[in-house]
Structures are given as structure tokens and as C-alpha cells.
């Protein structure tokens, strides 16, 4: 028969205290959850990884002790000073002047004079004289032109060939206009030349032209006595081809 304390149900004091400590430690582990394993599982296992509770190292800094973003690329920056600020873009305002101002037109500030001459840009520049301004023709020159036109018209009238009724009508109209001017202006042979004496050329041409334009075409020099009556439509009256006067209709 065993007579040891364990057989009698009595445990030594040291053994009992160790058993109690083991039981207490196991209970604390069960209350905190599953016991942690020293072996790390893979990411595919789905278990939470043990994070190292080591000391977080501060971010590395360059050896110079200054962040590279704060260093100046231009060594002369401190000498020249800070850069000038960028000017603010002015607002142009509405496209139509005075729009959105409730009908109040403010005075526009006076512009500064430009570099060239210091003249106000609003000052009007003198316009050059017009070269095509109307000029008065001297009486002597007008008489000379009137003396040359009838002979030119007679030459043109003699060169007209074929059915050119409209051209003949225009020539006759010019001759009639010359006749009216001869009646209102003094004859060319009465006009003195620049030297103060009548010009013989003007006198001869005036006498010949007066003979050509007088009468009803019967005294035309170098032209046939027969009158040619022209018709160029209902709106144009019949005109004599030689003297330019309206002629009676023979039809």
C-alpha cells in the first residue's frame, strides 16, 4: 500500500503553488484570445501579421541638414533681392463703352504723350490739300478749247461708218452744247493773248468755227449739203449728222 502524500490526496506546498500559477497563466491566455505563435503565417493564410513594435526611425535627411527644395538655385539671388511681382492684368471692361454703367459716362483719363515729339495722340494731323480740287479754267484757254472741238467733231463725224446712230447723236449733242456756249461766251477772236494782242490763230479758228456752226448745215465747209437724218429709236429725236440740229422727218 502506497503511503506517499500524493496517494493520501495531499500535495506538497511547492507543487500546489506551481499548479496554481500554471492554471492562472492559462486562464489569462484564454481570456485574451488565441495564443500568439512565434511563427509568422503567410499573407494567403488570412491571419493577422504581428507588427514589430520596434522604434520608428525618423525620415532620412541630407547631410547638409537643409531640405533640397529650400535651397536656392541662383547663388546671386540674395544679392539682387527678391524678384519683382508680376503686374496684375487689367480688366478690359465691356465691349461697348458705357455699357453696364447705368448711363453715366465717366471722363477718360488723358493719355501721356508718346516718345516721338511729345505730341498728344488725339491732336489732329493737318490733312494735305486735295489735288483733285476744282479749278477755274481761264477764259483764253476755254476759248481755245472751244475753237478746237468743232473741227475734231467734224473729223469724227466724217470717220463714222455703218449703222452708228447713237454715236452720231452724241456728236450732234456736243455740237449743240458748243453752240450754246458760243452764244453765252464772247467769241474767241475777241480774247486777247498773254502778250495783250489778239492771237491770229484763234481769230482764224474762231471765224472758221463760226461759219461751220452757223445756219442749218448749208454752209458747212468740206461737207456735203445733203442732210442725213438718223433714227436710233423712239427715245432719240432725229438729228442732222452735219450740224447736229433736229431735222424734220422725211418719212
Swiss-Prot record:
GO annotation terms (biological process): transport of virus in host, cell to cell
ATP-binding recorded as keyword: no
A GO CC term assigned to this protein in UniProt: ribonucleoprotein complex
Region of interest called Disordered, as start-end residue ranges on this chain: 25-134
Phenotype when changing residue 153 to A: Increases nucleoplasmic accumulation
Molecular functions (GO terms): RNA binding
Name of the protein in its database record: Long-distance movement protein
Species name: Groundnut rosette virus (strain MC1) (GRV)
Amino acid at each position: 500500500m502506497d503511503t506517499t502524500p500524493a496517494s493520501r490526496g495531499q500535495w506538497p506546498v511547492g507543487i500546489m503553488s506551481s499548479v496554481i500559477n500554471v492554471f492562472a497563466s492559462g486562464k489569462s491566455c484564454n481570456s485574451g484570445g488565441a495564443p500568439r505563435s512565434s511563427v509568422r503565417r503567410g499573407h494567403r493564410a488570412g491571419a493577422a501579421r504581428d507588427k514589430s513594435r520596434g522604434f520608428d526611425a525618423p525620415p532620412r535627411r541630407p547631410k547638409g541638414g537643409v531640405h533640397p527644395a529650400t535651397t536656392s538655385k541662383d547663388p546671386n539671388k540674395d544679392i539682387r533681392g527678391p524678384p519683382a511681382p508680376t503686374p496684375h492684368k487689367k480688366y478690359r471692361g465691356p465691349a461697348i463703352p458705357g455699357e453696364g454703367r447705368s448711363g453715366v459716362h465717366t471722363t477718360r483719363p488723358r493719355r501721356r504723350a508718346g516718345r516721338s515729339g511729345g505730341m498728344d495722340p488725339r491732336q489732329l494731323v493737318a490733312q494735305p490739300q486735295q489735288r483733285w480740287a476744282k479749278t477755274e479754267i481761264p477764259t483764253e484757254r476755254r476759248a481755245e478749247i472751244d475753237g478746237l472741238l468743232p473741227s475734231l467733231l467734224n473729223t469724227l463725224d466724217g470717220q463714222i461708218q455703218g449703222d452708228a446712230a447713237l454715236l452720231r447723236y452724241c456728236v450732234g449733242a456736243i455740237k449743240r452744247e458748243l453752240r450754246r456756249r458760243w452764244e453765252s461766251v464772247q467769241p474767241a477772236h475777241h480774247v486777247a493773248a498773254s502778250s495783250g494782242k489778239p492771237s491770229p490763230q484763234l481769230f482764224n479758228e474762231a471765224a472758221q468755227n463760226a461759219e461751220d456752226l452757223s445756219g442749218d448745215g448749208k454752209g458747212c465747209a468740206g461737207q456735203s449739203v445733203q442732210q442725213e437724218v438718223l433714227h436710233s429709236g423712239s427715245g432719240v429725236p432725229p438729228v442732222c449728222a452735219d450740224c447736229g440740229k433736229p431735222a424734220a422727218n422725211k418719212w
